[in-house]
UniProtKB/Swiss-Prot annotation:
Keywords: Cytoplasm, Nucleus
Protein name: RNA polymerase II-associated protein rba50
Subcellular location: Cytoplasm; Nucleus
GO BP terms in the entry: transcription by RNA polymerase II
Regions of compositional bias (Basic and acidic residues) in chain numbering: 125-135, 156-165
GO cellular component: cytosol; nucleus; RNA polymerase II, core complex
Gene: rba50
Comp. bias regions, Low complexity: 170-191
Region (Disordered): 60-83, 125-202, 223-261
Principal place of residence: cytoplasm
Subunit structure: Interacts with RNA polymerase II.
Compositional bias annotation for Polar residues: 136-154
Membrane-spanning residues: none
Length: 452
């Protein structure tokens, strides 16, 4: 045992109790809250500020790698325009004419005219913007006073200003020739005095001269001799002409020639249509549908029926079975009664004898084939009541044989059986057809064959 103790004492050692250290008391500050819970901090924890987020840095790097994406749409449009121009330059006259014929064959005339007007409008706007740029360049100081190192830029601006001067001079000269003689002639260069005389134009009216004075001014232009005729012809070829009729109320300029104004900004006179006018439908077509062809057969239902079309008139001495008209309850409507029934009863239609009220058996058989369920239901219900009265002997022996023959020739029984079949999905049509067949079977007396 002693040996074991010596071994453990060498390994573990002696257990010695040390004196305790001096304890430091920590005073806790007890905070009392009014509601029993600690107050919530209103400030968020501060985050480490970064100069740029990863997403922004990625997008910035992407924009640097692919510059010019903002004007991608304009570049695509310019590329398409250049490709079309190159293709047109490679085509000969026959190919161009063939392409034009193909376009005319595939596009309607009114749509093609609309596209042409849109193209002319865009072209005019583009030319107007170019002229404004040129006029702003003309109003710049004298380019000849620039230093020699800017000679190239000054020459380019000088050429553009010269071309603008020639264009305006050609327009003024053509207006002067048209107002004096009325015959076209090649434009000529104007002198400095003529240009100054055209700078200010006054329009004088005899009644209110002071109130209606209008001044037209042009920028001062120096006459430049050159290829005026070529530039004028080129501008006249590419710019659409505007017809400006001269004023007819005595409006004149300083030199006595009538001034011309563009009246396209004025609204067109509104034409009021009179329904009582005999040519009302022609005016209606010209105002709202000028590009559509006129088909008289399709327009006949708009016109009032003529007296000659009224074949179901009291003055008629005899009638056939297919001309006899019936009401919705299956009763016969006489010619005199058909003239007195008002239109709001629903018995007038655009069939034969539109002045007369009622439906014939032929018209009802036609409505039995209608794809509109309401029309089909009215026809089935009316035919069922007519056949019930017919088989009951209500129409007497004078009309009954002819009406029985007409019912069989019009295949009315077959049409009713088809409407009552399971293939018809409309339940109202099926139920009314079954009811009509039941009425036919209950009153089967004078028919040559069974109704069902």
């Amino acid at each position: 045992m002693e040996n074991h103790r010596s071994v453990f004492s060498n390994v573990i050692g002696d257990i010695v109790e040390k004196p305790p250290k001096q304890l430091v008391e920590v005073k806790r500050s007890v905070q009392r809250h009014a509601r029993g819970f600690p107050a919530v901090s209103r400030t968020l924890p501060k985050r480490e500020s970064k100069s740029m987020s990863a997403y922004k840095e990625k997008m910035l790097r992407k924009n640097k790698e692919s510059p010019g994406l903002e004007g991608k749409g304009n570049l695509d449009d310019q590329g398409i325009d250049e490709e079309n121009r190159v293709r047109l330059e490679r085509m000969n006259d026959l190919e161009i004419e063939g392409a034009q014929e193909e376009i005319r064959a595939t596009i309607r005339d009114d749509l093609l005219e609309m596209l042409k007007k849109r193209a002319f409008k865009k072209k005019a706007e583009r030319e107007l913007a170019q002229r404004k740029d040129r006029s702003s360049q003309v109003n710049t100081p004298d380019l000849s006073q620039r230093p020699s190192d800017d000679s190239f830029l000054s020459n380019e601006k000088l050429r553009s200003s010269e071309k603008l001067n020639r264009n305006l001079q050609s327009v003024l000269s053509s207006e002067a020739v048209d107002s004096s003689s009325g015959s076209p002639s090649p434009p000529m260069a104007l002198s400095q005095a003529e240009i100054r005389s055209r700078q200010t134009k006054r329009v004088m009216f005899p009644d209110k001269a002071e109130e209606l004075t209008k001044i037209f001014s042009l920028p001062t232009l120096a006459p430049i001799k050159g290829n005026e005729e070529d530039d004028a012809s080129e501008d006249a070829k590419h710019s659409p002409k505007k017809h400006s009729p001269a004023l007819s109320d005595g409006t004149t300029s300083n030199d006595g020639a009538p001034l011309e104004f563009d009246t396209t900004h004025l609204p067109e006179k509104q034409v009021t249509l009179d329904p009582n006018d005999p040519s009302f439908y022609e005016q209606l077509h010209d105002k709202y549908f000028p590009n559509l062809p006129v088909d008289e057969k399709q327009m006949q239902w708009l016109h009032d029926p003529s007296p000659a079309e009224n074949s179901y008139h009291p003055s008629v001495e005899s009638l056939h079975a297919h001309e006899i008209r019936f009401g919705f309850k299956g009763e016969i409507i006489t010619p005199s009664q058909s003239q007195t029934i008002p239109v709001n009863e629903g018995l007038h239609h655009h069939g034969d004898a539109p002045f007369s009220a009622g439906y014939t058996l032929v018209e009802l058989a036609h409505l039995l084939r209608s794809s509109f369920p309401t029309q089909r239901c009215i026809a089935i219900q009316t035919i069922g009541r007519i056949i019930y009265r017919l088989n009951s002997g209500e129409f007497r022996e004078v009309l009954s044989p002819e009406l029985h023959t007409l019912v069989e020739d019009a295949h009315i029984y077959e049409l009713l059986a088809a409407a009552a079949s399971d293939q018809v999905k409309h339940l109202t049509v099926r139920s009314l057809a079954i009811e009509a067949l039941w009425l036919c079977s209950q009153s089967q007396h004078g028919s040559s064959r069974s109704a069902v």
